[in-house]
């Protein structure tokens, strides 16, 4: 039976001509018996530069035990991983989105090179999740993702805190609303151990997405990183991959149009990160499934926001587990008719079957009932208008104002904007414009958590809006409009906004407009000259030259 499952790896291990390969593998401890079994790749994103993925080495060991117990031979390899929380607000942040595609490339190359029969990808920090999903989808061999889990919240003066509160405290100190000593206390308390950032930020949004879309086993992601149950989650995942291999269930069997619609609905219902828009567009492209920004807006309009989660809500991510897990979210989606219950998942069961097993904690108010949502429509809005002809994205929780008209405060890059905010130069009703931070212009489309948190920390979260061709962290809150397309570096209208121009944001009408005549806009665009690329060689230059628009997922395209 094992031989029948070695559909790919026999090319590496079987026959007289493969004696050299077997000799090399025996040098690191594999036996003839090991090499006669299906070879399972363990794609690990463990790295010692962040808490998000630090537990994945131990988790991988348990996964490998499960693989061996189920009749397979595991072989572990690593990819790169960039921590958004560590690099935020620096030049290093440009590497974050770029790493998504490099992770996809790494897994694809390892799968092609070593001819693994199946792959489990261990993921945690933001870009490792979509990157691994993209790589597995390209290979289209049996495989799935296993999420490392959320960090526990910290505690400060009787309050639960996360990394979000550290960044907001920086702005509060700059505004004179908090002392440096208090900031240090928050810094020391916010991240008490391993795991991904602890709200419905990008990592937990994408972990939720992967269970709902069917590419992660239901019931695994919500278990926190430091929870003792994670060991058994890893072991069972190792056993499951052998079953997935026997059934020859592949990513593209799972990633249907219906599955993507389910995923978008989960982002809307949970108030998830706007980064999910980029990543789902990119993953859909790998799966060959048509998907556009309009799909996100349409699904969000009909899906209620039911999860009271940070950054704008009350609860941290571990409370999802305490409420009953992502199965409860799945049940809300299925019961409300917001998801296709017949969509298949990696366990071989449908989403409806998985949702039916949900055990909801009595009295929990983390995941609200459908008849008492936080608001009747989802948190994602897609805006267009003469400032964003190809679209832009904003995430709302329900308390934000829906109309804002004000003067543009224009900054060519994140650092200049941050200096102005910290320096007290931004006033109520200003609309901050940060441009040349898009996929090409950055390059790398940096997240603006430092800037948005400084705005909130300074007490301007309800009176100042921000518009950028860059991205936002999942920890961002307020009227922060990102992913503006076309970006400034491609000659989008954002490039010709001048200091003091009137901008109008109308969320009810899904519009963001520069209040100038068509003739004035045309004249400015005609006079605009593209800036020189910021990098002339290396990965940054290559990415800037090949990356597509944010409205297409910011994916690399073949010239």
Curated annotation (Swiss-Prot):
EC code(s) of this entry: 4.2.1.9
Active site: 473
InterPro entries according to UniProt: DHAD_IlvD/Edd (IPR050165), Dihydro-acid_dehy_C (IPR042096), DihydroxyA_deHydtase (IPR004404), DiOHA_6PGluconate_deHydtase_CS (IPR020558), ILV_EDD_C (IPR056740), ILV_EDD_N (IPR000581), IlvD/EDD_N (IPR037237)
Record: residues binding Mg(2+): 84, 126-127, 447
Entry binding sites for [2Fe-2S] cluster: 52, 125, 197
UniProt keyword list: 2Fe-2S, Amino-acid biosynthesis, Branched-chain amino acid biosynthesis, Iron, Iron-sulfur, Lyase, Magnesium, Metal-binding
N6-carboxylysine modification, residue list: 127
Keyword rRNA-binding listed: no
Any single biological process term in GO: isoleucine biosynthetic process
Source taxon at top rank: Bacteria
GO MF term list: 2 iron, 2 sulfur cluster binding; dihydroxy-acid dehydratase activity; magnesium ion binding
Disulfide bonds: none
Cofactor note: Binds 1 [2Fe-2S] cluster per subunit. This cluster acts as a Lewis acid cofactor.
Record carries keyword Magnesium: yes
Reaction(s) catalysed by this chain's protein: (2R)-2,3-dihydroxy-3-methylbutanoate = 3-methyl-2-oxobutanoate + H2O; (2R,3R)-2,3-dihydroxy-3-methylpentanoate = (S)-3-methyl-2-oxopentanoate + H2O
Annotated metabolic or biological route of this protein: Amino-acid biosynthesis; L-isoleucine biosynthesis; L-isoleucine from 2-oxobutanoate: step 3/4; Amino-acid biosynthesis; L-valine biosynthesis; L-valine from pyruvate: step 3/4
SUPFAM superfamilies on file: IlvD/EDD N-terminal domain-like (SSF143975), LeuD/IlvD-like (SSF52016)
Family assignment from sequence similarity: Belongs to the IlvD/Edd family.
Function: Functions in the biosynthesis of branched-chain amino acids. Catalyzes the dehydration of (2R,3R)-2,3-dihydroxy-3-methylpentanoate (2,3-dihydroxy-3-methylvalerate) into 2-oxo-3-methylpentanoate (2-oxo-3-methylvalerate) and of (2R)-2,3-dihydroxy-3-methylbutanoate (2,3-dihydroxyisovalerate) into 2-oxo-3-methylbutanoate (2-oxoisovalerate), the penultimate precursor to L-isoleucine and L-valine, respectively.
Subunit structure: Homodimer.
Protein name (Swiss-Prot/TrEMBL): Dihydroxy-acid dehydratase
Name of the encoding gene: ilvD
């Amino acid at each position: 039976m094992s031989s029948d499952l070695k559909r790919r790896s026999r090319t590496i291990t079987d026959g007289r001509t493969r004696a050299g390969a077997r000799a090399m593998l025996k040098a690191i401890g594999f036996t003839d018996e090991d090499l006669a079994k299906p070879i399972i790749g363990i794609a690990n994103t463990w790295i010692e530069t962040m808490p998000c993925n630090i537990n994945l080495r131990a988790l991988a060991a348990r996964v490998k035990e499960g693989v061996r117990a189920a009749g397979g031979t595991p072989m572990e390899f690593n990819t790169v991983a960039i921590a958004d929380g560590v690099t935020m607000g620096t030049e290093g942040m440009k590497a974050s989105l770029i790493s998504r595609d490099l992770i996809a490339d790494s897994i694809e190359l390892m799968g092609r090179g070593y001819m693994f029969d199946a792959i489990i990808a261990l993921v945690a920090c933001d870009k490792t999740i979509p990157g691994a999903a993209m790589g597995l989808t390209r290979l289209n061999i049996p495989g799935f993702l296993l999420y490392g889990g959320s960090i526990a919240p910290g505690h400060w003066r009787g309050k639960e805190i996360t990394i979000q509160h550290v960044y907001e405290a920086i702005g509060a100190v700059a505004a004179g609303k908090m002392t440096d000593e208090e900031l240090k206390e928050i810094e020391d308390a916010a991240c008490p151990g391993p795991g991904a950032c602890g709200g419905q930020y990008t990592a937990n949004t994408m972990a939720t997405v992967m269970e709902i879309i069917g590419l992660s086993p239901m019931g695994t992601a919500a278990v926190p990183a430091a929870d003792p149950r994670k060991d058994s989650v890893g072991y069972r995942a190792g056993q499951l991959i052998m079953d997935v291999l026997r059934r020859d269930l592949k990513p593209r069997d799972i990633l249907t149009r219906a599955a993507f619609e389910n995923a978008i609905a989960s982002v809307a219902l949970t108030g998830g990160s706007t980064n999910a828009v980029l990543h789902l567009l990119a993953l859909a492209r790998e799966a060959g499934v048509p998907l556009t920004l309009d799909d996100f807006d349409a699904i969000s309009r009909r899906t209620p926001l039911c999860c009271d989660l940070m950054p704008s809500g009350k609860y941290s991510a571990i409370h999802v587990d305490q409420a009953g897990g992502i199965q409860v979210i799945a049940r809300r989606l299925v019961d409300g008719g917001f998801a296709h219950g017949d969509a298949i998942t990696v366990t071989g069961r449908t989403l409806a079957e998985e949702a039916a097993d949900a055990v909801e904690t009595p009295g929990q108010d983390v995941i609200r009932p459908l008849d008492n949502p936080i608001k009747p429509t989802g948190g994602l809005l897609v805006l267009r208008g003469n400032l964003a002809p190809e679209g832009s994205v904003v995430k709302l929780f329900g308390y934000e104002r829906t109309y804002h008209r004000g003067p543009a405060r224009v900054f060519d890059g994140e650092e200049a904007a941050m200096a102005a905010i910290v320096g007290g130069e931004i006033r109520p009703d200003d609309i901050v414009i940060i441009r040349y931070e898009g996929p090409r212009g950055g390059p790398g489309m940096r997240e603006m958590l430092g800037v948005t948190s400084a705005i909130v920390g300074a007490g301007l979260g309800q009176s100042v809006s921000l518009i950028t061709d860059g991205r936002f962290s999942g920890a961002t809150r307020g009227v922060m409009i990102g992913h503006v397309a076309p970006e400034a570096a491609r000659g989008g209208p954002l490039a010709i906004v001048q200091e003091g121009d009137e901008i109008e944001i109308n969320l009810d009408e899904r519009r963001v407009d520069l209040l100038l005549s068509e003739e004035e806009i045309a004249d400015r665009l005609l006079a605009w000259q593209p800036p020189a690329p910021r990098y002339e060689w290396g990965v940054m230059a290559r990415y800037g030259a090949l990356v597509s628009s944010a409205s297409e997922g910011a994916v690399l395209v073949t010239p």
